[in-house]
């Protein structure tokens, strides 16, 4: 395997492995609820445990990655992921699962700063937007894997056994993955001072907060909502897999498209408007109209999922957002904060209303319009 290809594989896996647990909860949610003996809304607290911790750590993830360097940062990412999957297989009960997922928050906080730093170090400028789209598609590769393979593994080995199968690739990447990064150099001084976001980064963080709320709510409860409409475990896995396939296509194709636009904020706005339509279609599903579930899942994959990759590409290419690693860490604070807040909030109204996530998407649309004005303001011109 060539060095360029191996670099792209490691970047994709660095994004995929920590996020796989999120899509696993969406896919295996009905089995987990039955086995753990907890109410359905408690699934939301599983997601909050991992992404809440990730959001907190993301405040310092950028400076930490700059201090560690990309090689040590990758090693910490993959080893913490392997530790999380080990604990998930070994610890009993609901709170054991909460602890295991919390450990995975370390890897999730590191993923974007480490991969963005590695891209800045190893990828030529003309290829950066495409590589960002590719590595961000790793998140949807995990959705595809979770939907296509985990239901079958869970039927044979149980949901814990299915997730334990992920330990082997995590260990292999922990040993081999960091070698793709440059050799460690002398460490820079470590500063734990939380950087203040620029005006444009603050607005983009707010948009990503809204996107995180919506995506986490949608994926966490899609499985149990579909089960309530009479869908089988295999069909639910197909929903998540389809969501993942559409997300991969959207991230790979739309990120370079956004890079060619004068201002990607307009692309964000269009995608978010379409995402609100996809959520509305999902809400109309009944036991006799499963096609609406498919339309909603595929639509969310094509629209809302791509916005995070576009946002990361904006941060990496536009110096007005700040240095790559710290600004990516701050952007992750917003995104992961939304992931932490969304499931418990939606759990309170689950089964009664889908208007909460639709309203949050429309709020993100308004913020996208604000971002276009901020980037066009005098002294804040978009840098390409």
Describe each model-derived feature in a short phrase.
Residues 134-178:
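Helix-loop-helix hairpin linking two adjacent transmembrane segments in secondary transporters
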Residues 57-69, 250-263:
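Helix-to-loop junctions at the C-terminal end of transmembrane segments
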Residues 25-26, 200-248:
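Extracytoplasmic gate region of multi-pass secondary transporters
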Residues 56-92:
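Conserved MFS/SLC helix-loop-helix module at the cytosolic interface between two early adjacent transmembrane helices
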Residues 318-352:
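A late C-terminal transmembrane helix in Major Facilitator Superfamily
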Residues 264-311:
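C-terminal transmembrane helical hairpin of 12-TM major facilitator-type secondary transporters
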Residues 100-138:
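Cytoplasmic helix-loop-helix junction between adjacent transmembrane helices
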Residues 67-78, 259-273:
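Cytoplasmic membrane-interface "Motif A"-like loop-to-helix N-cap segments
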